[in-house]
Amino acid sequence: DTITRLARTFITSEQVPLIPADLNLQKPLVELPDLILENALASWQQLIRDGEGLHGIAYDRLLTDLAANQQVVVCVDTVHGASRRYISRLLNNPPQERLILLRDNEDPTFGGIAPEPSSANMQPTIRALADRSEPLKIGAIIDPDGDRIRFTDGTIEISMNQFGAMAYHFLHEIKGKQGMVAKTVASSNLANALARQ
C-alpha cells in the first residue's frame, strides 16, 4: 500500500523529493554530476557475505564447492534478458563445461516467445540437462529482468512460488530462523499462509 501511494504521489507531482530539482534527467548518466556508479551484483554479494552470521549462507564456500564438484551441472536459461550478464559472475565463473547458458545473447524480441519462466519455456533447459551424465542437475529459467525464476532437476519442475514456500519452510523449521517474511508482488500468498502456520 505504501509503495502504491508514494508512486501515485510522485507521478502526479511536479517534483519527486528523492531527485534534486535541478537534475536534468535527459542527460546521459555519464554527464550527471556527482553520480556514483554502483556494481549491484558485487554489492549484493558483499551483503550476503556480511550477513552470513544472520542467515547462515556461506556464499564463498558454496561457490567453491560448486566449482569443485564434478558431479554437478548447472543449466540457466536467461531468455535473452538482463540477467544473462550476471549468471557466470553470480556463480563465481564455474568451469564452463558444467555451466550451460541458454538464450544468453541480446535479443530484444526474446526469440519470439513470451519471456516468462513457464513450464513450456523450461523445456530447452530440461532437454539440455537430459543430455548430461552428471548425477546432480540444477536447471533454472529466469525472466528478462531477473525477478521470476523456475527450477528443475531435469525431471521435476519447481515454480518460483513453490520454491519460496519450500525455502521459508526450510529456514523456519530446519534452520530455526524467526522473523518477517519478505516477498515480491509476483509472489503468491503461499508464503503468507506458511507464515501464519
Residue ranges and their predicted role:
Residues T2-W44, G154-Q197:
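Proline/glycine-rich low-complexity loops and linkers
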